[in-house]
Amino acid sequence: MSVFEHVDSPLYLGLMSGTSADGIDAALVRFADATHRRCELVAGTTVAWEPQLRETLVALGQGAETVAIDALGQVDAQVGLAFAAAANRLIGDSGVERRQIRAIGSHGQTIRHRPNANPAFTWQIGDASRIAEHTGITTVADFRRRDVAAGGQGAPLMPAFHLAMLGAGDEDRAVLNLGGIGNLTLIPRDGAVLGFDTGPANALLDSWCQRHHGTPFDAEGAFAASGRVDAVLLQALLADPWFALPPPKSTGREQFHLDWAVQAMGSARLDAADVQATLLELTAASVADALLRLQPTTRRVLVCGGGVRNPVLLARLAARLPGMVVESSARYGLDPDYLEAMGFAWLAAELLAGRAANLPAVTGAAGPRLLGAIYPA
């Protein structure tokens, strides 16, 4: 019998749009009990961004130096309204009564992440007041800034959720999220959890594919599979000093953007498919290098995020990680498409339960902190 069969607990709704800005993931979650250590996905949906707004978000995320305050204020409002619309669509499609949902956890859209600036800052837009207003549901948002205020990176935040859901294993595990940026959670049988960003993943692959193949992403890795890895370019990309930094570390599109990759090519005239293959290999290499260096005893790598649907990328990861099983998080009951949205529902639930949800060993914060700000219905 499922542990959820007779559970009549409140639902939580998570909203997430990542570095790739390919859509808003919305997930309705139910927890087995008040510990929030078991959860099920009740319903999920992904709502594509309106093309012009997505173009604006990608440009903002890539580090445009000057943005008019009026324009930014309008984008913040537009993103909030889009998040509210995604939540309302999921509620309508699921048939769940609005009163059953205790809170929405909204990540927002990151437009700048500067954890190493002085003073450090991170900025996610998507007006949470509008989400609360247009859904009629209490909304929790702004999860990252308290960790940054406490001296942390503000990212990644998902390792705490991964630990809660997957931390009872009898083997050394890793959870790999392949979103716009890759990030790893290392969960040893004994010892402290470690989590960090690994570098670019879908963000670069999508951008290059859009520019040279005319499609927003490389379906099943076919474009990359048609090319060959350029060893010189791969080494030039991996020579970026960021890859050698020890955890805690985090990054974003403002650092690993298409111009960064083009600059590494120099004057070389490379076939577009070969560049795509090399960018895919960069993702596999940066993940594998970090995993083999920091937890070589890993037996199982559970993959989530958009990259789980790229069999070429998964095959390259498996080839670089001999002796490790590389598989989808779905095997453990966690839908890879909605795992991050589920995580932000969990973060909202943890704040309302009065529990700290950052892992100082992961982010570098001075200590445990309550994450998020509450916007009442």
Swiss-Prot record:
It is an enzyme of class 2 (transferase). The keyword NADP does not apply. Pathway: Amino-sugar metabolism; 1,6-anhydro-N-acetylmuramate degradation; Cell wall biogenesis; peptidoglycan recycling. GO terms for molecular function: ATP binding; kinase activity; phosphotransferase activity, alcohol group as acceptor. Pfam families: AnmK (PF03702). ATP binds at G18, T19, S20, A21, D22, G23, I24, D25. GO terms for biological process: 1,6-anhydro-N-acetyl-beta-muramic acid catabolic process; amino sugar metabolic process; peptidoglycan turnover. It comes from the Bacteria. Keywords: ATP-binding, Carbohydrate metabolism, Kinase, Nucleotide-binding, Transferase. The keyword Transferase applies. Its EC number is 2.7.1.170. PANTHER family: ANHYDRO-N-ACETYLMURAMIC ACID KINASE. HAMAP family: AnhMurNAc_kinase. Belongs to the anhydro-N-acetylmuramic acid kinase family. This is Anhydro-N-acetylmuramic acid kinase. It comes from Xanthomonas euvesicatoria pv. vesicatoria (strain 85-10).
